[in-house]
Amino acid sequence: MIMKELIESIAKHLVDKPDEVNVADVETEQRIIYELTVGDGDYGKIIGKGGRNISAIRTIIFAINAKQGGKRARLDVID
């Protein structure tokens, strides 16, 4: 499973409108930026209380990326 699909799968399980979840990736020389967009009202569910959900998702992404030895990864949630 590629990283983009993993992010999308996790996000779809957290939101009320899974059909509106979209992940785009922007690659630069030094990093890959994943841009997650969700439907209206679902932004808070992705962020979670005190940022716990987004922090956990980012930790998983960083850990997998470090193990694979790829470019640095960043996850942005677009509202």
Segments predicted by a language model, with ranges:
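RNA-contacting regions in translation and RNA-metabolism proteins
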Residues: 1-45, 53-79
